[in-house]
A protein has these predicted regions:
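Membrane interfacial helix-start motif at the N-side
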Residues: 1-10, 14-36
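Transmembrane helix recognition focused on a "late"/terminal membrane span
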Residues: 2-12, 38-138
């Protein structure tokens, strides 16, 4: 019995779009993946921070979700830059098919770098603004 074939482009896309909730981990490893569940815990944790610290800056309220998405962007790059041979050995050993990456994956990785680096740099800048000036610059 052959297993389903795991698509590297789809896994990278899930990591970029829904990675903050662990969708890529659940696609690759199943519904009980511990790191996927850790990603999923970012949403209730964000809700708890919002409920407990209502007077806090919105950046701090969204920080668990921001961290989860930054990690997911990194995972999208790792997934997308894995060679097809290593990908098939790790995820498609019993599927009977081989993977072949195309230009869609390359565009997705470029977009991931653009968005991921922007989010990371903006988060670091806002964090230092809040910690050192109390939010005086915005």
């Amino acid at each position: 019995m052959s297993k389903t074939h795991k698509n590297k482009t789809l896994a990278s896309f899930l990591a970029v779009v829904l990675g903050g909730f662990g969708a890529h981990r659940f696609y690759l490893k199943g519904p009980l993946d511990r790191l996927g569940l850790l990603h999923l815990c970012a949403l209730p944790l964000t809700g708890m921070v919002y409920g407990i610290a209502q007077e806090a800056d919105p950046f701090f309220k969204l920080l668990p979700l921001i961290v989860s998405y930054v990690v997911a962007f990194l995972e999208a790059l790792i997934i997308g830059l894995t060679s097809d041979e290593k990908w098939d050995a790790a995820h498609n050993a019993a599927s009977g098919r081989t993977s072949k990456s195309n230009w869609v994956l390359a565009l997705l990785l470029v977009a991931t770098m653009l968005v991921g680096c922007t989010v990371l740099i903006a988060s670091i800048a806002r964090l230092f603004d809040l910690l050192y000036t109390g939010g005086a610059y915005g």
